[in-house]
């Protein structure tokens, strides 16, 4: 393989020949590659290399001598979590109700609910879920193909560590050969797409449970299939709210639910229910608001740039440095956002706070209006994240409604307050506010009529009995502890149905009163509520550290549930036991602890309430030191995902309760007993006293310092009472560093039962490490730690720390005393891992390739640790990234689609109703804005703006180069013609027939592309040799290109140019028209990728990548500036320009490659858009020759793999040698080949139609065929790596082998290899080429990755995205147009030009820049630029410079 050959080639520079041969022999057939593919004598040859001794490719050009320039930057990603310095982040800790809760205690606050599905539907969903579970990992072909972790001796490590440094993932993680038939392989490959993505370790069971819940727990996905006939509104409401029977709809009203926001929806009043429904699509990645704010630190406010994107509020020290977020606030855990009332009169309220379940953040805006806008935006996000799912549903049984009354909470609408009994257990009372902007009185009258005769109202009227029940001392419920339960009076009607809602109502104003009768009137937090799957309210007590999309919410029924036996008793923040940090202290199970009786709104309880509790006067019981409150990872997974519910009769909590003297045992339910899995032995001390244990260990000889470190680390909990907490933290860090190495906390996925793994930890260490891991990175209990490694993050200086790997995250935490760096990198953002040489002698490097971001470099002390880390990450990537469910890759997407379908169906049914009326939303919005109430609209298209220009435009596309450079513009222009515009392509004359065949106007551009290609191949793109020959031979060629481009663009309204043309930006300036750029390779400055012309074999990091763009721009402009400026003065009538004046980096840019192939870097501004490939599909009408069709059919019949080989119209010195190598490689790999031999078509001295050597029957030669048809017939493709050809082969979903020759081909070869969907050939010879062919056609890992990528690319619509981007950016492009005024005062012009040149800091002779008088061409005004009318003064020039600098702010040179 190419990467294998590259590894040996690079090793040869530092190893002797003997060591290299040993490396080959020791590796041997460990890659499961047949014996015949071992390297031959030609392994170091390259038949495509130029024969000239002075030839220099771009990989050996000037960029290669600038190694690791700028060092490795401080990487942070969007996910970097860095503990702030003391001056900005410590303030506010300890101010909330939850700052003393650990992760387990927070999780125990989670109150799950009964599933709303009927019992028979439960069983049916369970059967469906079990039937759709993925196969066991041992049966998974993709995972089974992964190699076993090899147990190597130290000697093996020393012998193999060096030559494996440069191995790619395809080499150190190869597939095992499959024994299946090709047909079985094909079927099983297709079957993988239908399987749900597997996470690793113990999370597999969790994932299975989640999937089954998603299928059955969501009302929108049950019984909502589209029917052929119209469905009545009553039937649709029955389906959505899951009523037992269809109920007649008495009335429906558009209304707004009033909570922290004003939510638009509809109220439906049926015979038995009052229902509310609103659709709120979640915006996971949209930027809601940006701007500067002050954030409160310890002693002062610090100013940062804030970005509210999705549900994360990030802030930056420098807005231009998107790689270095100061910190991120996850609003999924936020509780409230509010403006702080200013106590000083006359001063504006500019301070606002955001409260999470851990702390309170304080911010200060520049104005009161800005503060309110930020609060409104954050409140919207909080509401979205706290609502269960993508729709708000409230179903209130009419018989539960106690009171309907008007409210004056809003001045601009009629507001109705509905008080309703929540459930039959506690008789808690909820309040909901609904605002009506139309027909409010009608709604109020109907509601009053409907509830006038309900049983609650009658009882309250006749008996004058307070509906709030008397409470009993003890009663079990679905809380994790014992709670107060009401004793229902005999004359109180029984609640047969509970209120069901996906969000919590507003807090009741009676919560804080001391009367015990007011306990029932609570803020919906004392008593557990049933929601969709996992209930989370807007109150502080209900905020939990878990993601809003982590578990699917489901609309709920009853109020009681049965907890799993793995759950621990809850603990309140005010619990006496919560005051200590020791894990050995807990409450006696028999006491009425604060967790057992106290509500989570206890912060507002009065002194009499607190003293009224009997357990206040008792000391907390202390359990034995051996009992740990933390759970095993398996238990934690069940704990975090236990959403099992029942919809039948009440099922009480099973708790181990020891009655005390103060407790009336007669009130305990008879069913209360010990849990089934309670082990009596666990209540006894498992370990002796820490000091005696130390004496015992001291009796043994101390052989290793790491042994003591490990022992002390195991006893850290027991020694917590002896050492100070802060000192213990330093001790744990040091002891961990002393132990070093790596640790695995469970068996890796995909291993066979007899496989072994280094460093496996026992259960005690694994549990403690998992707890520490979740504490460091604030992960939920469901996040299971799998492995950890000690390594150094390579920056300017190595940053020593610890790598943590779980099923979903790759994390790093610095252990350096002065560093607080943390990295939290989702596994889904990792593309690949590459082994590299270490930066330091004796260290071994690992590069993490990340989507849209520069690589992360880590150094390990041993190659063994580096290899295990790489294999661990790759196994997780295989599980989570490439085994996708057919319907959706994540639950979030499927939830969004289900909610949208539900919304559409309900809207269709509502439109059939006569009561449906339109409301003027603008009036409501203005009124709400006056009161500063944030709005959420029901219509997801309410914010859509049509950017399409009213008049058709003449759009010219200017490009030079090969056929691959022209083809994307033909596809774009065809779509522009459909939009009603006039399209024209300006390029080389040889492409005119092809362009005009598609009905597109054409204009010729001079220049011979064959000559340009020749010097590119011989010298490399824009190397010193290229520039030298271009200056000596192609000055006239550049003049012809510029002049012909100027003529071809006359009459254009918009110009789209490939920047390689070099003339377009100047033509657009002269014509004063909007200018866009479009290209097939990265041309905009970024740290994620190097410039396409400066790709090296090694990953050099973000500093090098960014430098290549600056250096290239400087060299490129220096080479052409003199000639271009001369042409500007002579033909365009423009003055000289420079890089800063052109503002090229501020121009809108369209990249016509897929975002799945080249993910947009995080540091690209929003005017740069990766649109997707602009494919030109010509295969629909293509009829293949009969002999080609017969060749393909015969290959399938013979069960032989088909490969395409074609390197385009390249120029090489020895085409015969290349042909012979291709023939020999095809025969050796035992495949069939379709050959497109164009490597001697240009500048050849003989007829290229005659083959240099005879072709065997296994090879079929073609002249041309559409790629979109041909690649569908192939199993793999080999080509030169042009953007269009690469896109075509990747869209077909086949592995791609690339042998780059010049230009951007090296870049796409690297991308294909990084994604794991192909191979980058460094050399072409029989040994390397044949091995690459065999791997591309037999590696199931590569085949499946390519297939998945092809599916994603086929979903793109690049031309349409490009057109919409043009529409959106057209106004911005117009603002960059420089207006010119006709010259009429030569002295003023000279004077103005002189000022401009002084601004650039250049000494020039003013007399040397007189313009040559030229007659303007038709349609062109020969103007000269002016900075203003009349005479100039120094002040005007200063203002001009200031405005210019502001316009080029963050993305200029």
From Swiss-Prot:
InterPro entries: ATG26_PH_GRAM1, ATG26_PH_GRAM2, EryCIII-like_C, Glycosyltransferase_28, GlycoTrans_28_N, GRAM, PH-like_dom_sf, PH_domain. SUPFAM superfamilies: PH domain-like, UDP-Glycosyltransferase/glycogen phosphorylase. It is an enzyme of class 2 (transferase). Disulfide bonds: none annotated. It catalyses: a sterol + UDP-alpha-D-glucose = a sterol 3-beta-D-glucoside + UDP + H(+); ergosterol + UDP-alpha-D-glucose = ergosteryl 3-beta-D-glucoside + UDP + H(+). Residues 513-524 have a biased composition (Low complexity). PROSITE patterns: PH_DOMAIN. UDP-alpha-D-glucose binds at residues 962-963, 965, 1265, 1267, 1280, 1283-1285, 1304-1305. Residues 235-282, 771-837 form the GRAM domain. Residues 581-608, 660-669 have a biased composition (Polar residues). Residues 286-383 form the PH domain. Sterol glycosyltransferase responsible for the glycosylation of ergosterol to form ergosterol-glucoside. This is Sterol 3-beta-glucosyltransferase. It comes from Phaeosphaeria nodorum (strain SN15 / ATCC MYA-4574 / FGSC 10173) (Glume blotch fungus). The lineage of its organism: Eukaryota, Fungi, Dikarya, Ascomycota, Pezizomycotina. The gene is ATG26.
């Amino acid at each position: 393989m190419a990467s294998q050959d590259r590894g040996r080639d690079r090793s040869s520079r530092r190893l002797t020949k003997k060591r290299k041969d040993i490396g080959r022999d020791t590796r041997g057939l460990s890659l499961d590659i047949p014996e015949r593919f071992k390297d031959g004598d030609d392994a170091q040859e390259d038949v495509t290399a130029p024969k000239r001794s002075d030839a220099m490719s771009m990989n050996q050009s000037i960029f290669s001598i600038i190694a690791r320039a700028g060092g490795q930057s401080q990487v942070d990603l969007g996910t970097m979590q860095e503990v702030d310095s003391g001056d900005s982040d410590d303030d506010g800790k300890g101010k909330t109700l939850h700052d003393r809760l650990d992760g387990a205690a927070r999780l125990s606050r989670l109150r799950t609910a009964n599933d709303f599905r009927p019992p028979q539907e439960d069983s049916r969903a369970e059967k469906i879920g079990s039937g759709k579970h993925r196969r066991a990992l041992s049966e998974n072909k993709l995972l089974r193909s992964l190699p076993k972790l090899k147990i190597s001796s130290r000697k093996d490590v020393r012998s193999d560590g060096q030559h494996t440094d440069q191995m790619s993932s395809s080499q150190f993680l190869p597939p095992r050969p499959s024994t299946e038939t090709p047909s079985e392989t094909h079927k099983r490959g297709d079957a993988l797409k239908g399987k749900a993505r597997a996470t690793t370790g113990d999370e597999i069971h969790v994932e299975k449970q989640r999937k089954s819940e998603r299928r059955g727990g969501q009302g929108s996905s049950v019984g909502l299939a589209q029917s052929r006939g119209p469905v009545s509104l009553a039937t649709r409401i029955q389906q959505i709210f899951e009523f037992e029977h269809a109920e007649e709809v008495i009335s429906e009203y558009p209304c707004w639910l009033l909570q922290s926001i004003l939510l638009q929806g509809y109220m439906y009043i049926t015979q038995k229910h009052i229902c509310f429904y609103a659709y709120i699509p979640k915006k996971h990645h949209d930027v809601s608001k940006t701007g500067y704010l002050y954030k409160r630190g310890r002693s002062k406010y610090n100013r940062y740039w804030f970005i509210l994107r999705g549900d994360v509020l990030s802030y930056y020290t420098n807005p231009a440095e998107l790689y270095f977020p100061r910190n991120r606030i996850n609003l999924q855990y936020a509780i409230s956002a509010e403006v702080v009332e200013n106590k000083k009169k006359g001063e504006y309220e500019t301070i606002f706070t955001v409260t999470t379940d851990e702390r309170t953040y304080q911010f200060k805006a520049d104005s009161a209006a800005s503060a309110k806008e930020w609060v409104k935006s954050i409140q919207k996000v909080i509401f979205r994240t706290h609502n269960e799912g993508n729709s708000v549903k409230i179903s209130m049984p009419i018989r539960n409604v106690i009171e309907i009354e008007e409210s004056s909470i809003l001045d601009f609408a009629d507001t109705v307050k509905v008080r309703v009994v929540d459930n039959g257990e506690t008789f808690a009372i909820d309040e909901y506010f609904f605002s009506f902007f139309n027909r409010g009185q009608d709604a109020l009258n109907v509601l009053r009529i409907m509830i006038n005769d309900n049983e609650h109202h009658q009882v309250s009227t006749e008996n004058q009995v307070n509906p709030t029940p008397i409470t009993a001392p003890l009663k079990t419920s679905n809380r994790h502890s014992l709670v107060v339960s009401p004793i229902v009076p005999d004359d109180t009607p029984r609640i047969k149905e509970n209120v069901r809602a996906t969000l919590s109502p507003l807090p009741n104003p009676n919560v804080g009163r001391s009367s015990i009768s007011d306990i029932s009137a609570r803020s919906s937090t004392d008593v557990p509520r049933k929601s969709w799957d996992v209930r989370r309210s807007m109150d502080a007590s209900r905020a939990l550290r878990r993601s809003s999309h982590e578990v699917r919410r489901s609309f709920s029924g009853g109020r009681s549930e049965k907890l799993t036996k793995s759950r621990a008793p809850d603990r309140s923040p005010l619990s006496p036991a919560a005051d200590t940090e020791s894990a050995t202290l807990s409450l006696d199970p028999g006491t009425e602890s604060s967790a057992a009786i106290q509500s989570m709104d206890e912060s507002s309880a009065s002194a009499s309430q607190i003293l009224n509790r009997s357990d206040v006067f008792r000391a907390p019981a202390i359990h034995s030191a051996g009992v740990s409150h933390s759970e095993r990872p398996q238990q934690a997974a069940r704990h975090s995902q236990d959403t099992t519910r029942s919809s039948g009769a009440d099922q009480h909590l099973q708790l181990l309760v020891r009655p005390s003297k103060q407790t009336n045992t007669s009130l305990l339910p008879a069913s209360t007993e010990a849990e089934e899995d309670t082990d009596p032995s666990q209540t006894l001390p498992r370990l002796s006293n820490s000091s005696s244990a130390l004496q015992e260990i001291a009796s043994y000889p101390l052989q290793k310092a790491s042994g003591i470190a490990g022992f002390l680390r195991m006893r850290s909990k027991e020694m917590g009472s002896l050492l100070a907490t802060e000192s213990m933290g330093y001790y744990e860090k040091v002891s961990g560093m002393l132990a070093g190495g790596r640790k695995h906390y469970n068996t890796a996925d995909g291993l066979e039962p007899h496989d072994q793994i280094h460093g496996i930890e026992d259960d005690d260490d694994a549990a403690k490490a998992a707890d520490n891991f979740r504490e460091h990175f604030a992960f939920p209990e469901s996040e299971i730690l799998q492995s950890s490694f000690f390594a150094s993050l390579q920056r300017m200086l190595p940053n020593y720390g610890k790598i943590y790997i779980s099923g979903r995250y790759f994390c790093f935490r610095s252990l350096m005393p002065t560093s607080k760096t943390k990295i939290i990198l989702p596994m889904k953002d990792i593309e690949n891992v590459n082994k590299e040489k270490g930066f330091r002698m004796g260290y071994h490097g690992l590069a993490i390739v990340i989507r849209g971001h520069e690589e992360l470099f880590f150094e390990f002390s041993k190659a063994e640790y580096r290899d295990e880390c790489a294999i661990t990450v790759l196994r997780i990537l295989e599980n989570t990234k490439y085994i996708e469910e057919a319907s959706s890759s994540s639950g979030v997407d499927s939830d969004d689609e289900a909610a949208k379908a539900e919304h559409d169906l309900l809207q269709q049914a509502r439109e059939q109703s006569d009561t449906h009326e339109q409301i003027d939303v603008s009036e409501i919005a203005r009124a709400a804005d006056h009161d500063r109430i944030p709005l959420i609209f029901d219509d997801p298209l309410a914010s859509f703006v049509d950017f399409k220009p009213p008049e058709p435009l003449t759009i010219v596309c200017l490009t030079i180069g090969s056929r691959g450079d022209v083809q994307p513009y033909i596809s774009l222009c065809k779509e522009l013609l459909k939009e009603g515009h006039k399209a024209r392509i300006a390029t080389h004359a040889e492409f005119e027939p092809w362009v005009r065949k598609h009905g597109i106007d054409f204009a010729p551009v001079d220049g011979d592309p064959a000559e340009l290609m020749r010097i590119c191949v011989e010298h490399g793109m824009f190397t010193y040799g290229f520039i030298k020959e271009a200056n000596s031979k192609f000055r006239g060629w550049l003049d012809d290109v510029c002049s012909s481009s100027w003529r071809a663009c006359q009459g254009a309204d918009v110009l789209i140019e490939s920047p390689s043309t070099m003339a377009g930006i100047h033509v657009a300036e002269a014509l004063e028209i909007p200018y866009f750029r479009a290209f097939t390779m990265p041309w905009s400055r970024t740290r994620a990728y190097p410039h396409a012309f400066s790709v090296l074999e090694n990953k050099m990091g973000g500093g090098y990548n960014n430098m290549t763009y600056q250096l290239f721009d400087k060299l490129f402009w220096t080479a052409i500036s003199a000639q271009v400026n001369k042409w500007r003065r002579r033909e365009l009538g423009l003055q000289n320009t420079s890089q800063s004046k052109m503002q090229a980096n501020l121009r809108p840019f369209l990249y016509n490659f897929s975002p799945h192939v080249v993910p947009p870097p995080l540091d690209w501004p929003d005017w740069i858009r990766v649109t997707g490939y602009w494919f030109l599909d010509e295969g629909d009408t293509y009829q293949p020759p009969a002999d080609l069709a017969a060749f393909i059919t015969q290959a399938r019949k013979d069960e032989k793999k088909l490969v395409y080989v074609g390197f385009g119209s390249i120029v090489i010195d020895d085409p015969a040698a290349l042909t012979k190598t291709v023939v020999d490689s095809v025969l050796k790999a035992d495949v069939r080949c379709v050959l497109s031999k164009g490597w001697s078509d240009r500048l050849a001295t003989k007829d290229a139609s005659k083959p240099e050597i005879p072709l065997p029957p296994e090879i079929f030669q073609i002249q041309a065929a559409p790629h979109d048809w041909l690649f569908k017939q192939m199993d793999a493709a080999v080509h030169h790596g042009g953007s269009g050809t690469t896109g075509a082969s990747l869209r077909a979903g086949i592995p791609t082998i690339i042998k780059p020759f010049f230009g951007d081909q090296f870049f796409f070869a690297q991308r294909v290899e990084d994604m794991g969907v192909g191979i980058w050939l460094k050399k072409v010879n029989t040994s390397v080429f044949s091995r690459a062919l065999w791997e591309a056609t037999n590696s199931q890992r590569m085949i499946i990755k390519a297939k998945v990528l092809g599916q994603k690319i086929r979903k793109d619509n690049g031309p349409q995205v490009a057109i919409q981007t043009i529409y959106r950016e057209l106004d911005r492009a117009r603002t960059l147009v420089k207006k010119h005024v006709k010259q009429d005062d030569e002295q003023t012009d000279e004077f103005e030009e002189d000022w401009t040149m002084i601004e650039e800091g250049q000494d020039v002779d003013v007399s040397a820049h007189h313009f040559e008088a030229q007659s303007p061409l038709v349609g062109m005004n020969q103007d000269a630029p002016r900075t203003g009318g009349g005479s100039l003064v120094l002040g005007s020039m200063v203002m001009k410079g200031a405005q210019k600098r502001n316009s080029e702010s963050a993305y200029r040179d």
